[in-house]
Amino acid sequence: MENYQKVEKIGEGTYGVVYKARHKLSGRIVAMKKIRLEDESEGVPSTAIREISLLKEVNDENNRSNCVRLLDILHAESKLYLVFEFLDMDLKKYMDRISETGATSLDPRLVQKFTYQLVNGVNFCHSRRIIHRDLKPQNLLIDKEGNLKLADFGLARSFGVPLRNYTHEIVTLWYRAPEVLLGSRHYSTGVDIWSVGCIFAEMIRRSPLFPGDSEIDEIFKIFQVLGTPNEEVWPGVTLLQDYKSTFPRWKRMDLHKVVPNGEEDAIELLSAMLVYDPAHRISAKRALQQNYLRDFH
C-alpha cells in the first residue's frame, strides 16, 4: 500500500469501494479496488488469492485480450486491494452521453466494433475457463482510444456475486441468463453469452432489452419477447427449481420488431446469443466467426 497514494473515491463496485490512486514512484494513475470480505476476521481466502493471481497471469500474457489489465495485488491487514489500469468511462456512461447530444442511436460501425471487442474479451476468458457471471454496461470500460475492455472478469468465481451492491441497490437483473433466474445450480459460459446478447441489443436499440424490476418481472419480460419456454425448445426447463407450470404462455416475437434498426447480420447473431437452451447458445469463439463480426479479424 505504501507505493500508492489514494486520490479520490470513484465508486462503489460490485465487490467494494473503488479508488483512483497514483503510484508514488512512476506517477501512473490506477484504479484500486478494495475487496470487501464477507468475514473480515477470517482474512482473505487463499482460494481467492490463487484465482486472482491466475487472473493476473492471464492478463499479463496478452494485452490484446480486451480485458482491463490487473497490474498488482496488494494484501495487507486482512484487506485485499486489486490494482487495475485506470479507465474513467464505462459503456453505460458512454451511451448516456451520446443521448445527451440528441443522437437517437450509436453509430452502427461503433456498435459492431464494441460488440467484436466484447465477444473477443469473453472468448479470451472462456478459453481459460474463466466465467464473468455479471456482465453489464457498467462493467465494460472504454479507453482513450475508444476501445472497449471488460472489467471484473474472474472476480465472481473468487468472491461470488452479491445480491446487493455496497449502496444496497439490488444488482441489476437485466443481463441475467434465464437459467440463473430459474434457479439452475449448474451453469457455464452461456451465462456470459446471454449477457452479451442483452448488451448488444441495448447498443442497437438504445434502451435495455429486458428491464425487469424483480426476478419474476425479469423472467416475464424475457418470456414476452422470446416466448414462454417449454421442453421442446429447452429440454429440462420444467425441472428447474423456480420454473412454474402456471407461468403465462407468451408467443415468441419477431426480433426484427424488438430491435427494429438492427441489420440482418446483427439480428442473426443476436438470435444465436439469446437461445434459451444454454447447450445451444452460440459460443464466443463461434460468434467471432459470424458474418456480423467477420470484418474485424
Curated annotation (Swiss-Prot):
Cellular component aspect of the GO annotation: chromatin; chromosome, telomeric repeat region; cyclin-dependent protein kinase holoenzyme complex; cytoplasm; kinetochore; meiotic spindle; meiotic spindle pole body; mitotic spindle
InterPro entries in the cross-refs: CDK (IPR050108), Kinase-like_dom_sf (IPR011009), Prot_kinase_dom (IPR000719), Protein_kinase_ATP_BS (IPR017441), Ser/Thr_kinase_AS (IPR008271)
Regulation affecting activity: Phosphorylation at Thr-14 or Tyr-15 inactivates the enzyme, while phosphorylation at Thr-167 activates it.
CDD domains reported for this sequence: STKc_CDK1_CdkB_like
Disulfide bonds: none
Key words, A-Z: ATP-binding, Cell cycle, Cell division, Cytoplasm, Kinase, Mitosis, Nucleotide-binding, Phosphoprotein, Serine/threonine-protein kinase, Transferase
Subunit composition and interactions: Forms a stable but non-covalent complex with regulatory subunit suc1 and with a cyclin. Interacts with cyclin cdc13. Interacts with cyclin cig2. Interacts with cdc37.
Protein name as it appears in the record: Cyclin-dependent kinase 1
Gene: cdc2
